[in-house]
Amino acid sequence: MSSIAKSARIHKLAVVEDGAVIGENVVVGPFCHVGPKVVLHDSVQLLTHVVVTGRTTIGKGTKIFPMAVVGGDPQSVHHGGEETTLDIGENCTIREGVTINTGTADYGGKTVVGNNNLFLANSHVAHDCRVGNNVIMSNNVMLAGHVTVEDRAILGGGCAVHQFTRIGRQAFVGGLSAASYDVIPYGMLNGNPGVLSGLNIVGMTRAGIERSVIHRVRRAYKSIFEGEGSIRDNATAIREEYADCKEAMEILDFIAADSDRALSSPNRGKG
């Protein structure tokens, strides 16, 4: 049996399968289809022609536009029909034609999307991705499987992100770019193949980071990417100097972390 709150509004031309859980003030518009293992928390809106399927949970206040398909099976040759999950946070906006898939059993079985994210038309989040909070994915952005996008990153229209790549917090990936390697926090990546083109100074300023801090982060960036050694050696060498700068340390910790991908840099041959 479904659990449907009394204040929920479900159009007579919508299909809500037995077993679905529908919270207070949820709106399910005409021609929507909600699967039997779906949980829609309070004030979720499915406008029209929206499919929510699989073992999918959608947080409060999220709004989904027509032709989006959320919770579909992972597009992976390794998927054997196992039951996997998708968790979407609160107050996300999921525009027309967006697709977000569940995870795969071999990698924990879960795709996770945080809060306050904006997914513009026809963008795609593949299996096992981790998307943080306040992320903007512009039209036709494609995340391959196992991608991590950290908080407040912005991905420009039509860009593609290679599987297992990490996009750091408040990074910016330009439109039509190919992000084949990890992008540092506050980094700016452009082109195909993608090349690191400096820091996202505009984004840092909008986030309220003080100018003096931005200058220090720029100096750290130059030491890392313009020094004589490798990127990782250079990053290790300056850790003590920047120990009191949270933003610089965030970059250094990102570089030091284990990853399946190399690091994007101004010079792709160096890493």
Swiss-Prot record:
Taxonomic superkingdom: Bacteria
Any Pfam family matching the protein: Acetyltransf_11
Gene3D superfamilies: Hexapeptide repeat proteins, Udp N-acetylglucosamine O-acyltransferase, C-terminal domain
GO molecular function: acyl-[acyl-carrier-protein]-UDP-N-acetylglucosamine O-acyltransferase activity
Record flagged with keyword Transferase: yes
InterPro entries linked: Acetyltransf_C (IPR029098), Acetyltransf_C_sf (IPR037157), Hexapep (IPR001451), Lipid_A_LpxA (IPR010137), Trimer_LpxA-like_sf (IPR011004)
Single biological process term from Gene Ontology: lipid A biosynthetic process
Name of the protein in its database record: Acyl-[acyl-carrier-protein]--UDP-N-acetylglucosamine O-acyltransferase
Organism: Rhizobium rhizogenes (strain K84 / ATCC BAA-868)
